[in-house]
From Swiss-Prot:
One Pfam family per UniProt: Thymidylate_kin
E.C. code: 2.7.4.9
GO biological process, one term: dUDP biosynthetic process
Catalytic activity: dTMP + ATP = dTDP + ADP
GO cellular component: cytosol
Binding site for ATP: 9-16
Family of this protein: Belongs to the thymidylate kinase family.
Gene from which the chain derives: tmk
Designated name of the protein: Thymidylate kinase
Organism whose genome encodes this protein: Francisella philomiragia subsp. philomiragia (strain ATCC 25017 / CCUG 19701 / FSC 153 / O#319-036)
Family matches, as InterPro entries: P-loop_NTPase, Thymidylate_kin-like_dom, Thymidylate_kin_CS, Thymidylate_kinase
Length: 204
């Protein structure tokens, strides 16, 4: 049976590297998978991603607008890419899903987790990942890592207090969900790889 796997974490936590390990694992077992990301994943969702992260317009994006654009993209992503793949028996691995909105917008932007829960219950009730791996990193370290890769986007410019709030929500979500696992992303790459494989062994 196909699995929906989500990698979560702050910017600079090493999600792309972790997804590479998951791909290596699934390939070793000859298991088909689609690899995708949020915000984005489909043409429409990628357009919304560009607005949310870069905003080339001379107009401030209100936090509520940011949230709803992300959810519009997420609905497109799930209905047009994720759900069809799972129906065909293909595994899906996503760099972020709705936990990122709960943590970043609900916590970081201080919009409130209750508002996010209403959106999830209304639009994504049947969109539950089978496995969520959260990579935990100190925000200062994560932002320093992300800064070495490229220019910071709108969200990466939000400041340490924003990311401290975001991290706290992520950790509370892990604690409340039986299908979620936290990995210390400050460990060596080899240790992280082994921990990811140990988690995947429980599902495949």
């Amino acid at each position: 049976m196909s699995k929906f796997i989500v990698i979560e974490g702050l910017d600079g936590a090493g999600k792309s590297t972790a997804i590479g390990f998951i791909k290596k694992y699934l390939d070793s077992k000859s298991l088909a998978a689609v690899y995708t990301r949020e915000p984005g994943g489909t043409k429409v969702a990628e357009e919304l991603r560009s607005i949310v992260l870069h905003n080339d317009y001379d107009e401030e994006i209100h936090p509520d607008s940011e949230l709803l654009m992300i959810y519009a993209g997420r609905i497109q992503h799930y209905r047009n890419l994720i759900a069809p793949a799972l129906t065909k028996g293909v595994n899906v691995v996503s760099d972020r899903f709705y936990w990122s909105s709960i943590a970043y917008q609900g916590g970081g932007r201080e919009l409130g987790v209750d508002k996010l829960n209403v959106l999830n219950e209304t639009f994504l009730k049947d969109c539950q990942p089978d496995l969520i791996i959260y990579l935990d990193i100190d925000p200062a370290i994560g932002l320093a890592r992300a800064g070495k890769v490229g220019s910071p986007d709108r969200i990466e410019k939000a400041g340490l207090a924003f990311f401290d709030r975001t991290r706290a929500v992520f950790k509370s979500l892990v604690a409340a969900n039986h299908n979620a696992y936290e990995i210390d992303a400050s460990q060596s790459i080899d240790v992280i790889e082994k921990e990811i494989y140990a988690i995947l062994d429980k599902y495949f």
